[in-house]
């Protein structure tokens, strides 16, 4: 499995100009996730970095996720998997037929995009994971949007 650097140094934290409203003495800051160097940056890269650490220490050979194929989450997960030399499989609701830049990018990265009715998402995910296991593969599933423990941990570090 290839090593990749999703981000290597702390990001700047920028103060926000005073907001309108009564916030007392509170001050607001923004962590500049847009400056992350991997896959055009953003908060989803921060989440992907936590999943990367888990995948790197597992026997996974297929990365699976759920989401709109045009989402930043799917783009970043497909990019991460390709950068690691792993296959990627995206389960996407068929109600999402719009082809945007991210959709083309996900496909160019070699990810398989499988559509299903939104009512069949859980069943489709379980069936696909089982099919990969029957093939002798080891799928690693990332919840849509990168939600879950690793994604949450990325914000408390």
Which residue ranges define each predicted feature?
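PLP-dependent amino-acid enzyme catalytic core
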Residues: 1-157
């Amino acid at each position: 499995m290839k090593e990749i650097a999703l981000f290597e140094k702390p990001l700047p934290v920028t103060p926000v100009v005073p907001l309108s409203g009564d916030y007392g003495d509170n001050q607001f800051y923004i962590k500049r996730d847009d400056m992350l160097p991997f896959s055009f940056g953003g908060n989803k890269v921060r989440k992907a970095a936590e999943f990367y650490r888990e995948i790197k220490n597992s026997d996974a050979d297929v990365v699976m996720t759920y989401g709109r194929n045009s989402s930043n989450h799917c783009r970043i997960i497909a990019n991460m998997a390709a950068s690691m030399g792993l296959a990627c499989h995206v389960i996407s609701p068929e109600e999402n037929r719009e082809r945007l830049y991210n959709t083309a990018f996900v496909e160019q990265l070699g990810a398989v995009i499988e559509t299903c009715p939104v009512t069949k998402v859980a069943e489709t995910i379980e069936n696909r994971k089982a099919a990969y296991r029957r093939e002798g593969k080891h799928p690693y599933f990332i919840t849509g949007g990168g939600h879950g423990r690793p994604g949450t941990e990325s914000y408390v570090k």
